[in-house]
Amino acid sequence: MNEKDFVKLCKQTVAKYANEHLDKSDGKQINEDDVFIVWMCKTLQNSKALVSTTLFDGMYYELTYNGNKKELYLDAYKKFQNVCISVDG
């Protein structure tokens, strides 16, 4: 799968997943334009992307494409906390 097709697949998959898990009473839905790639790489036939949306829900997604099996894996994470830790150099 080339980069363009992988990006499109990631955006479609995350938009669909997010819409299926949003609070239905809010009436909010997103589309591919509300999904963005934070980081992406390709090694041999495999691809991985870290993805987020414009929603303020703290969700973060990791998508991995296994080129051998032609399978896409989705991991969904929710940000719990962000802390600064001072490290002595």
Question: Where do the model's predicted regions map?
Answer:
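Amphipathic, interaction-prone secondary-structure segments
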Residues: 34-71
